């Protein structure tokens, strides 16, 4: 907690102990191992010795968890804490039904959702801070097993009000040109609201805009796709977003006020499960994956 928070105050609060207790513990630990673990600046920083200690501590913690999982599996005790990394919007769409179905079969397993960016999920997985991620992998990652979940597609969403305001009677011909050219240049006068580049929708959106060859008028950037979707509905700009988000969250009445532009194969990608390769694979991870696959096909 201290290495992550880089603050005695924040780490002590997270651990539900006093700052003095934590400070005394670290000082005693440093005395025992004969090395200084932290540079006590603001924020705190691990020394080289601290980085070594943390690496071994995380490895030991991971081995202890694996041992407990294997013992539970041998004794057929389905219990424990399953930590899952997933993007916030994807979690909102997928997890309620998946977790409900999973906990019917495994009522004594607690699920903790770590809702964060795709890149942060990968880092936490490699650091053994989470057991399973649900994300798009752009490349193979050493030490990580990947398994296909489902295919996702980004679309471009523009409100009819915004199209009428910018293009008037020409809006249908503009959209027809976009479809024929498979290029967004005809929309060069349209404002955009974009996810940040670290997110899938933000990355794909920027690739399409760069290919179109014009400098887009980006009105808003955000990490929250649902905020951007609401802005697009209000006519603030065109928005790149996952098609599944529209289908699962918007009413037919709202969809009728929007124009959805499909962008072809370049806007499609695969969502996968990812979990660290271990000497022993916790059975509960496989069980969760199985339930999720069954649920998505319903």
Go through each PLM region and give its residues.
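Beta-alpha-beta core module
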Residues: 141-148, 152, 185, 226-278
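Hydrophobic hinge/microswitch elements
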Residues: 118, 126, 136, 198-259
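N-terminal winged-helix
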Residues: 19-20, 69, 75-106, 110-123
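Short helix-boundary/capping micro-motifs
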Residues: 1-16, 43
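A short LG(V/I)-centered, amphipathic sequence patch enriched
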Residues: 30-48
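Secondary-structure junction motif
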Residues: 164-167, 171-212, 281-290
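Alpha-helical linker/hinge and terminal dimerization helices associated
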Residues: 32-33, 53-75, 137, 292
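Short beta-strand-centered segments that line the small-molecule binding cleft or hinge
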Residues: 98-101, 119-169
């Amino acid at each position: 907690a201290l290495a992550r928070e880089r603050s005695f105050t924040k780490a002590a609060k997270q651990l539900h102990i006093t700052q003095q207790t934590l400070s005394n513990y670290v000082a005693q630990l440093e005395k025992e191992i004969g090395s200084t673990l932290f540079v006590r600046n603001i924020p705190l920083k691990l020394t080289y010795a601290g980085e070594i200690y943390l690496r071994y501590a995380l490895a030991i913690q991971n081995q202890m968890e694996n041992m407990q999982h294997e013992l539970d599996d041998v004794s057929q005790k389905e219990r424990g804490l399953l930590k899952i990394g997933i993007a916030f919007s994807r979690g909102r769409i997928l997890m309620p039904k998946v977790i409900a179905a999973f906990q019917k079969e495994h009522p004594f397993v607690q699920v903790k959702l770590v809702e964060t960016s795709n890149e942060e999920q990968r880092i936490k997985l490699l650091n053994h801070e989470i057991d399973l991620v649900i994300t798009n992998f752009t490349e193979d990652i050493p030490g990580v097993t990947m398994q296909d979940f489902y295919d996702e597609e980004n679309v471009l969403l523009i409100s009819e009000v915004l199209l009428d305001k910018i293009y008037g009677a020409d809006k249908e011909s503009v959209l027809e040109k976009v479809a024929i050219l498979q290029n967004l240049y005809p929309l060069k006068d349209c404002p955009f609201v974009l996810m940040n580049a670290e997110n899938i929708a933000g990355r794909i959106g920027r690739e399409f805009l760069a290919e179109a060859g014009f400098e887009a008028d980006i009105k808003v950037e955000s990490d929250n796709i649902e905020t951007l979707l609401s802005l697009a509905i209000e006519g603030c700009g065109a928005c790149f977003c996952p098609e599944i988000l529209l289908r699962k969250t918007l009413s037919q009445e709202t969809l009728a006020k929007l124009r959805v532009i499909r962008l072809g194969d370049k806007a499609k990608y695969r969502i996968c499960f990812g979990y660290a390769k271990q000497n022993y694979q916790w059975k509960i991870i496989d069980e969760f994956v199985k339930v999720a696959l069954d649920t998505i096909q319903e």
